[in-house]
Amino acid sequence: MDKKDLFDVFDGFSQNLMETLAEAEALKKQVQDLVEQNASLRLENDKLRDRLSHFSQMEESDPSSKAISSRKENLENIYEDGFHICTFFYGQRRENNEDCAFCMELLYRE
């Protein structure tokens, strides 16, 4: 193997290392994004669980008609916080706080 061939081999090896490094950086970024998204979803989930617990306690303590209006008010608060309250997407964050026809039907039906 002459010097030129040896140089070409090292050059190819160097290029492969650079490509592998770029792929590793891309994977690292993806993992970081997923970890951030997971943390955000965990916070949302905890918040929704707290609200659900609060609603359950309210329901057990006051089953009168006042509790019904209180439940509706709580659903409105959840909806205003940017979460779906409909059966199709319950607990999911609304995209760009756009109105959901299913949620609106739940809020405003008589």
From Swiss-Prot:
Q: Which prosthetic group or cofactor does it need?
A: Zn(2+)
* Keywords linked to the UniProt accession: Cytoplasm, DNA replication, DNA replication inhibitor, Metal-binding, Zinc
Output the GO biological process annotations, alphabetical, semicolon-separated: DNA replication
* Superkingdom in the source lineage: Bacteria
Query: What is one GO cellular-component annotation here?
Result: nucleoid
- Cofactor note as given: Binds 1 zinc ion per subunit.
Residue positions binding Zn(2+): H84, C86, C100, C103
Membrane-traversing stretches: none
What are the boundaries of the signal sequence?
A: none
Q: What is its main location?
A: cytoplasm
Explain the purpose of this protein. Answer: Involved in control of chromosome replication initiation. Inhibits the cooperative binding of DnaA to the oriC region, thus negatively regulating initiation of chromosome replication. Inhibits the ability of DnaA-ATP to form a helix on DNA; does not disassemble preformed DnaA-DNA helices. Decreases the residence time of DnaA on the chromosome at its binding sites (oriC, replication forks and promoter-binding sites). Tethers DnaA to the replication machinery via the DNA polymerase beta sliding clamp subunit (dnaN).
Subunit comment for this entry? Homotetramer. Interacts with both DnaA and DnaN, acting as a bridge between these two proteins.
Q: What is this protein called?
A: Replication initiation control protein YabA
